[in-house]
Regions:
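Non-catalytic cap/lid and distal C-terminal segments of serine-dependent acyl enzymes
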Residues: 1-170
Length: 170
C-alpha cells in the first residue's frame, strides 16, 4: 500500500506540519478520505507504528490521513495554535489538491483515539458541512470530570491554555 510521509506548510498554524497518508491500491479515484486523529501522548506516526492500519484498509478504496495534532485536543487554542481550523478547514483542501481525494462532505470522515476521539467529534460538530461522519474510540469526552478537575493534575495548565478555564472546572 503506498505510504507518504507528507509535510506541508500550514498557513493557519504558521508552521510546517506533517501527516502520514495511506493511498489505496484498489478502486477508481476520487477516493473518500478518513482523517485518523491521534491521542494526547502520541503524534501522527502512532497509527502506522502501533496498529495494523495498512492491513485494515488494504482492500478498501480509501485514503487515510493521519495528521499531527500536537497536544491541541484539535481545538483553536485560547493561547496557542488554531488546530481545529487547521485540520477542519485547511487540511482537507491541502489533501484534495495533492491526492486523488473526493472533494465533498460525503467523501470525508473523522475518527480518533482518546484526545483524537474528542477531536473527531469536535471537528464533525464544528464543521458539519465538511465531514459526513465521526467515530470516537475511547474518546476523552468528559471535561469537567475526573481527572481533569483535580488540582494536582499535571496537565491542567496546558489544558487551560488550550481549552480555557470553563472546560475543566477552572
Amino acid at each position: 500500500m503506498p505510504f507518504c510521509d507528507f509535510h506541508y506548510f500550514s498557513k493557519k498554524l504558521g508552521i510546517q506540519s506533517a501527516a502520514y497518508v495511506l493511498l489505496p491500491e484498489v478502486g477508481e479515484p476520487p477516493f473518500p478520505t478518513l482523517y485518523l486523529l491521534h491521542g494526547y501522548s502520541d503524534d501522527h506516526t502512532v497509527w502506522h507504528r502501533r496498529t495494523r492500519i495498512e492491513a485494515y484498509v488494504a482492500n478498501l478504496p480509501l485514503i487515510v490521513v493521519m495528521p499531527h495534532g500536537g497536544h491541541s485536543f484539535y481545538c483553536d487554542a485560547v493561547e496557542g495554535y488554531p488546530y481545529a481550523s487547521a485540520i477542519g478547514e485547511e487540511l482537507p483542501e491541502i489533501i484534495e489538491r495533492n491526492f486523488p481525494a473526493q472533494k465533498d462532505r460525503g467523501g470525508r470522515c473523522l475518527a480518533g483515539l482518546s484526545m483524537g476521539g474528542y477531536g473527531a467529534f469536535k471537528l464533525a460538530l464544528t464543521y458539519p458541512d465538511r465531514f459526513a461522519a465521526a467515530v470516537s474510540h475511547s474518546g476523552a469526552l468528559a471535561f469537567g470530570h475526573y481527572p481533569y478537575t483535580w488540582d494536582g493534575n499535571a496537565y491542567r495548565p496546558e489544558q487551560q491554555r488550550i481549552l480555557g478555564q470553563g472546560y475543566i472546572g477552572g
